[in-house]
Amino acid sequence: MNTATTANIQNNNPTAFYHLPGLFEFYELYRIFLPLFRKHREYFYDWCEIGSIYGAPSDCIWGGGRTSFGYSDPEDVLDLVREYGISARLTFSISLLREEHLTDKKCNELCKMFEHASDADNSPHTHQLQNGVIVHSELLLNYLQKNYPDLYLISSTTKVLTDFQDFLTEINREDFRYIVPDFRLNKVFDKLDLMSQHQKDKVEFLCNECCWYGCKERKQCYETAVSYTHLRAHETR
């Protein structure tokens, strides 16, 4: 599981929005942490907020790039984030998806459930709350846009966008609400400063990457994780 935290800084409102991992895996932790975060904000910096919590249940074939060990009930998970008005993101960042995987029952049921989550009750926190999907595969991107249009999409860091021009091309796509570039672009301030405000607002930075800066195998590692933890498990059933 990649436990990276990303932050989106909005210049017109100087607040750092952190996107936390372990939506399913750390469910029991969030049951304790979220009430604490809401009731005792004096324990935390006033310039930070929770932008979303992301993850996928164990054994999701659309998952990818990281191993998942979450076994919590999706309805319980959804109830928790909805109660606190937090966007939930499904980590469906598989890079080796094939056409036959699109009909997977479990993943489609999750998308349907998360797409309509804010319609389930009249809690004031759920007003205009929207959930999303972190995606890598263009095949899956097109499928989600067609079948689950109310889920917003995030371009996954598993694409390993290290070239700044490629990153800008991704930023300018209307398909994505947010883009997570490779961590090696985090400090190219001279280029980041030249971006428009609209472009800047779409960027989320990976803050605690475990790879060393000169790693040349990061993309291959993500693909290996997909092959061994997702595709192979499903193909051997």
Write out the residue ranges for each language-model feature.
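N-terminal basic/disordered segments at the start of proteins
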Residues: 2-49
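Active-site beta->alpha loop and helix N-cap motifs at the rims of alpha/beta catalytic domains
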Residues: 22-30, 51-147, 152-162
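Active-site glycine- and acidic-residue-rich loops that bind
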Residues: 24-26, 181-193, 206-223
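Distinct, well-ordered alpha-helical segments
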Residues: 29-37, 101-107, 142-148, 164-172, ...
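Active-site-adjacent beta->alpha loops and helix N-cap segments on the catalytic face
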Residues: 71, 138-144, 186-198
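Conserved strand-turn element in the central/C-terminal portion of the radical SAM core barrel
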Residues: 96-98, 176-186
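Glycine-enriched alpha-helix->loop->beta-strand junction motifs that scaffold or abut catalytic
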Residues: 147-153, 171-179, 198-203
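Conserved small/polar residues in nucleotide/adenosyl-binding loops
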Residues: 229-236
